[in-house]
């Protein structure tokens, strides 16, 4: 190691930028202030206020507000549950254990059905009840229940208020800026994505890019929610933001649909690729208008109206251009703060799907884990069993919803071991020698500031530093009055580590469903919703089914099972393209009764091919032949409406043809 690596420039305090110092100082002051206020309010465990301030330390105002609301609601609900359950079962330890395990299992199940601050509220309701109720097993007076519950809630609220106040004093980046930047970047990336997908090749890079675009658009919904909570203007523009997200999803679908047509088009015009690249280059410019676009794509206009392939591609390309220009105009209105609510209709938020089987399994895992640890604690008369139960409850509730629970639990184990060693040195080497809180704060403030800076400067270890910051308060355990008992300290820390280790064991025995099994469940749900789309009065609108389909696809975006991801993506895109054709057929009107019967026949053909169980290959082959025959017949028809219908039916043919290599029912392998 050379001497330059030890220079002052490489120290975290000198490497930090102004934004990093603002973030570190804001969170450090909030945590120290929360600890001080809770300590002088004579709350018995003021370190929970410091932990609460650390948890809500989001980099944006909207994130702090939404998470704080969820934390307050969850803490109140958890405190009420703890009072009711512990108050009625305090003298019956087995019944107490059963009721608390059932409550935490319910909270684990419920948080899987929601997103954002609602899911966070249910998580808090679960482990706040655990934090309050499990230590109550050693008390004898029922009146202490209320004292402990209100102390925990007050500590949480103090931490939230301190975090919110420091966010107002030292504000960070604007949620509005982050959202608008993300929308503009995605708007530009859609053109790059179109250029990639309209290539004739089929590679894993194309699939990964498509999954990435879908995931980024769905992630922007979180930015929209944060902007909603932090800016009055974005609360007024919420309908427009929802419509913009739906538009970007629709453009993603149209890009995919155009790719299918290009791959199934035997002889496209020779200059198609060059014209498409010229079009994408022009759309990237903010000065491009509809007339410029019309001049560029004019050479692609079909000269033979009987060429239904050319007509279908032309119509879909024009639709994509119109969507992109409309989205550009809406983004410009958002940036310029134009108050015009009549431009876009009110649109619902992005739909989502809950895997009920996985949610039930997670709730059952939490219930069984706590029953096992509780039974062991009761049978062995372990004094620190409450700490093991509390950490196991937190681990089961928090990590049931993550993609890699074993990695997260292993990281938490490492965090607890490091904090046990660190807190031993701090508690019995420093804290026993000081008598005033301000002396301890002189040590705590620079320590927290340095840890916050390291979290920002070491992204590879950001999760570790974040957990060290959040859990440090409960290990140092600044109480009022202070307690220094080495036996209790060792027993409590050992119990916390054992609780997480047993939660890890529970995840190993009651393992989450494999990605292949999850993929089959998502595909089955997609097919079930698509069958509903074929009915005369579908439950979901076209946009709702589209966002729901993309939500299904995004659920395995981090999966290592390439086959499961590939077939979930393929089924989602196929069914989505077919649903767009079905909606267009449903809206298509003709005065010719024979043509209307042809349209109805196309929809009925889909009903014969698709079911919740899968696709029948024999029926699929016959349906594709029939659709091709319908296209050829309509192309020779004398009515313009018939040739228009032929173009729509050919799009349906292109979408369905991708399922010719679909795996057998119940598997993901051919």
From Swiss-Prot:
One of its GO terms (cellular component) is plasma membrane. The keyword Nucleotidyltransferase does not apply. It comes from the Bacteria. It is found in: Cell membrane. It holds the Pfam family FUSC. Its main location: membrane. The chain crosses the membrane at residues 23-42, 47-69, 76-98, 118-140, 153-170, 381-403, 410-432, 437-454, 461-483, 493-510. GO terms for molecular function: transmembrane transporter activity. It is a multi-pass membrane protein. InterPro entries: PHBA_efflux_AaeB/fusaric-R. The keyword Glycoprotein does not apply. Keywords: Cell membrane, Membrane, Transmembrane, Transmembrane helix, Transport. Belongs to the aromatic acid exporter ArAE (TC 2.A.85) family. This is Uncharacterized transporter YdhK. It comes from Escherichia coli O157:H7.
